[in-house]
Amino acid sequence: MIEFGKIYNENCLETLGRSSESFIDMTITSPPYDDLRDYNGYHFPVEEIAAGLFEKTKEGGVVIWVVGDRTYNGSESLSSFSHAFAFRDAGFRVHDTMIYAKNNPIPSDCGKRYRQAFEYMFCFSKGQPKTFNPLTIPIKQEKAFKSFRITKV
């Protein structure tokens, strides 16, 4: 059984497996991707995790999945999009795709391509999200976003 207010330091599939009901309102995570770090042989099963999160997320709940792509030999892996398709295939709606602009990206000076100074923030929802809180405080880059509008879906 899951105790609310407790932090579990374990494989998320084990944690999800301890509940028989949909109990999650929101998940926010930046999982490991593209073998950029060694996790002692741990393989990250995106499809299993997406399916487990879909099963345990409440109707109207959301998953914010922050992920980027590895650049290898001048080519991006596009694994972030593979993750998005895995969540869609598990049953989630792709509610929003946002860009997280990193303030302090990993330096790269290859001189042949733009530096990847961002990650994708995919917002997956199980049905229509229960809550939407648009930005109401002005941001530094506000002029750049003037052409974007919030629309009802």
Where are the regions a protein language model picked out?
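Core catalytic lobe of class I
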Residues: 1-153
